[in-house]
Each structure stands twice: as C-alpha cells, then as structure tokens.
C-alpha cells in the first residue's frame, strides 16, 4: 500500500526495480500502473509451490522474524499478472541457488532479457549493470 501511494503521488514516470520476491511485486505493480520494471533474479510465483514457504522465517538483512501463512500464499497467487513484454527487463544469473532462472526466462518470454552464466541469487553483477539500469529508467 505504501509503494502504491508513492507511485500515485509521483509527478514523473516511475520505473520499478525488484529482486527475488520483490521482482514479483514489481511485476504486479508495473501491470497495475502501466510502468516499466527491471526484474533481478525474480520469483516467478506462477511456478512456485507457496505451500513450501508456509511457516516461520527470518529476514536475511534485518533478522526480523515473520510467519508466512496460507493467506499470504493466496494473496501472492492472486497477484500473478502476465507481463506486457515492452515493459520489462529481466536480469538473471544462471547460478541462482534459490530460484530457477529458467522459470523467470519462460514467464518473461518476449521481454528484454539478460541471462548470464554463473553468479548467485544476490545477482553478483549488480554494480556492473547499475549504469544500464539507470539508463533504462531514464535517469
């Protein structure tokens, strides 16, 4: 809801950037608001079994604990939106140990794609691609 308010209040075109599950949310918001998005090793939720994630988890960055419920799984499934090809740039590394890059490549077929050998889920080449991401966003 907070991101939606920021998008709605922006006085200029917004380009979203999301990785992992944030890539799923970026896709959802890009379709909702007609925006462009850069998706970095995104979760292609359509291919995932949400039941595998139900339970307690710890945020890797903050250490915060949270519980992923059946209601969350239903909510995620309802947010799956087929991508509009001209709006997305998929950045994936084949060495992603968390998500299968082929699922994202299939889901975003027809979209601009950069799929690189090696790497991992953190997208090890982020700094290398930052200038191109900013250019894609018109910044």
What annotation goes with each model-predicted range?
Residues 13-15, 36:
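Structural motif
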């Amino acid at each position: 809801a907070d991101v939606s308010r920021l998008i709605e209040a922006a006085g200029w075109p917004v380009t979203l950037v999301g990785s992992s599950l944030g890539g799923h949310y970026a896709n959802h918001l890009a379709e909702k608001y007609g925006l462009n998005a850069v998706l970095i090793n995104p979760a292609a939720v359509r291919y995932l079994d949400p039941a595998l994630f139900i339970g307690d988890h710890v945020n890797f960055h903050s250490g915060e604990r949270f519980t992923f419920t059946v209601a969350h799984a239903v909510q995620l499934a309802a947010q799956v939106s087929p991508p509009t090809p001209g709006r997305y740039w998929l950045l994936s590394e084949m060495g992603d140990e968390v998500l299968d890059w082929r699922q994202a490549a299939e889901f975003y077929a027809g979209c601009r794609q950069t799929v690189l050998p090696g790497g991992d889920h953190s997208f090890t080449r982020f700094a290398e691609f930052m200038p191109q991401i900013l250019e894609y966003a018109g910044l």
